[in-house]
Amino acid sequence: MATKIRLQRHGRKGYAFYHIVIADSRAPRNGNFIERIGFYNPNTNPATINLKFERALYWLNVGAQPTDTARNILSCEGIFLKKHLLEGINKGVLSEADAKSKFEAWKNVKRIAIQNEINKIYEQQRIVNKAKLESERVVNQTKTKVLAQKEKLLKEENNTPLPSE
C-alpha cells in the first residue's frame, strides 16, 4: 500500500490548522488515515509544530512519501537529518556518538534561532505598544487642556453679570 505523510485540514474558515497524518495515497484529503503523528498551526508566530518524532522517522524509513508541505515541516523538525545520519551509521561512515553529537548540535542551533526570532517578535510588539501608549498619553493631555479651557470659559460666563433688560 502506498502511504503518504500529509496534512489534514481542520479549523474554521480563515483559521485553519492541520493534523499531520499517515494515510493511504488514494484516500481523500480529510478521509481515513492510518496514524496521526502530529499537529501544525500556521496561525501562530512562529508556527506551532508538535510532532511524534520517532513515529515520523519510522514511517519515512518504511517508505511513506511526504507531500511538499509535510516535507518542509519534517525538515524543520530535523527528521530528514536524523534519517540521513542513521543511514551513515548503517553504512559505517559515522559512529553513533558522532551522529548523536551532530544532531544535538543542529538541534541547539535551531532552538537558539527560534528563540531569537521569538525575542525579536516580542521586542517589536513592545515597541509598538510603547508607541501606542505614548500617542494615547498625548491625546489625553490635549483633551484635558481643552476641557480645562472650556471649564474656565464657563466659570467666566457664570461670574459675569447678565445684562439687564
UniProtKB/Swiss-Prot annotation:
GO terms for cellular component: cytoplasm; small ribosomal subunit. One of its GO terms (molecular function) is structural constituent of ribosome. It comes from Azobacteroides pseudotrichonymphae genomovar. CFP2. One of its GO terms (biological process) is translation. HAMAP family: Ribosomal_bS16. Belongs to the bacterial ribosomal protein bS16 family. Keywords: Ribonucleoprotein, Ribosomal protein. Disulfide bonds: none annotated. This is Small ribosomal subunit protein bS16.
